[in-house]
Amino acid sequence: MKIHEYQAKAILARHGVPVPQGEVVSNATEAREAAKRLGGGVVVVKAQIHAGGRGKGGGVKVVKSPDEAETVARQIIGMQLVTHQTGPQGQRVQRVLVEQGLKIKRELYLGMVIDRSTERPVIMVSSEGGVEIEKVAEETPEKIFKEFIHPTAGLSGFQARKLAFALGVEGASVNQAGKLMAALWAAFNATDASLVEINPLIVTDEGNLLALDAKMTFDDNALYRHPDLKELRDFAEEDPLEVEASKFSLNYIKLDGTVGCMVNGAGLAMATMDIIKLAGGEPANFLDVGGGANAEQIKNAFRILMSDSSVKAVLINIFGGILRCDILAEGVIAAVKDLGVRVPIVIRMEGTNVEQGKQMLRDSGLNFTTADTMSEAAERVVAQAK
């Protein structure tokens, strides 16, 4: 689950991470009043959406007066902000963060994620703040420094000092950086976060460290332990089809292609998308119905697939284990009849009751195309999607 910048900063501040003073507002008048309360001087008006690249898209503006803050907020609130992470359709801005302006001496990077190879949290720092860490990793990987955190021992003082020296901070800022990293770990650990990122972490002219921007995402599987975090979820920022799929325990992610995919198992789903691309097509989605899906879930999955107007053909790739092939066939047949599906459907299934499932498809009187291998299925569905 993602949250907004202002929400992430509030969580980090509660755990001791220093952040700039600011207020989130939903209209231009409130922006002017917020700017007044922040001293009436230089403030930054920042669009709040679940995407990076807001500045380049025109969603972050520095202003010098409350009146200018009102004018800029009126321009930003309600705009369809397009960034490299939103796609060409953009994301509608519903609120802005009005934040105190600061004199910046240096911009650094500080982040924390789960490292899958070591199965431990890893804290990362870089002197190259203000740019995407992926770009730094690609172009100047030697400027990224990491420390792996033992999940029970936590972040050690010597690790924090080592990273502070790697950043090139000096004097009292070393201890300040150490305390900030400890606070970041506390927030990460306490909230079951999957990512915490401060980019940039700034050093002011006075030598103070502050989180100028913040991003947090959380493990959905742990949200039952954090009802307070669940309340921060902004459904307006999420794809409506993804929200609908989550109601039926379906893992759905919308993509930009024309071949709809329905698969059981995340690994098989990713392999299916790969083989569609190898066949010259583009997947329209990632859809994992899970190993124990029933006919009703299959029907709901189909309904969600068909809600995407870009889908020109559907590939169903199922390995029948807990989800038997006859149950799959029952759900698919019911969905196609009830929803009046008109796009071509290619089905490849193997496993429990596969012959029974294939016979049900043949007896349905519906125009399904079957395939025995993944490559055959991909070639057929790509041809029919053109």
Residue spans for each PLM region:
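Short amphipathic alpha-helix used as the core "switch/output" element in two-component signaling
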Residues: 333-334
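Catalytic core of bacterial c-di-GMP phosphodiesterases, primarily the EAL and HD-GYP domains
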Residues: 321
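ATP-dependent carboxylate/acyl-activation modules
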Residues: 1-197, 202-316, 326-328, 337, ...
